[in-house]
Amino acid sequence: MNEIILIDAGTGNLRSVQKALENVGATVTRTDDPQKVLSASKIVLPGVGAFGDFMSGLRARGLDDAVKQAVSREVPMLGICVGMQALFEIGEEMGDHEGLGLLKGTVVRFADSLSVKIPHTGWNQLTVKNEALLFDQIQDGAYVYFNHSYYCQPWNSS
């Protein structure tokens, strides 16, 4: 496994993500330097907190443009939590905020009318809609842990 650039946008669970990656044999470099992101061969974008604050942290460090340029060169990237949400065009948490726009769609709050408690916290089953390398070793229906009040609504579900 090549070096993975772990982006530090000023918020996030960096240490736990770094340890998880190292546990599977990855060499990890934590950085908030756009130049390191631009030269990356793999990127992980973790995040915790509010969408708008997270995007402000990316922009203040010049990481938003660096991520977009890296992805345009087809550098593999994984977004975790708010890092995944940031890949979309708009996040609606505490007002509308512009995301990175790498994926078409919006990050929206779960409806209060749902019969589940929001935030959704706990173990639940995954439903894998499409085959993807990321889910290659994960069975449809596998249990994973969730802690969120918002979800990504892509414009195209494929």
Predicted regions and their residues:
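Structural signature of beta-strand start/N-cap positions in the alpha/beta core
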Residues: T27, K42, P76-L78, Y143
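Extreme N-terminal starter segment of soluble prokaryotic enzymes
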Residues: M1-I5
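Short acidic/histidine-rich motifs immediately flanking catalytic phosphotransfer sites
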Residues: V37-G47
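Cysteine-nucleophile active-site neighborhood
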Residues: G49-T121
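Short acidic low-complexity segments
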Residues: V28-S39
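Short glycine-/small-residue-rich Rossmann-like dinucleotide-binding loops
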Residues: T11, G47-G49
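Pocket-forming structural segment of enzyme catalytic cores
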Residues: I90-S158
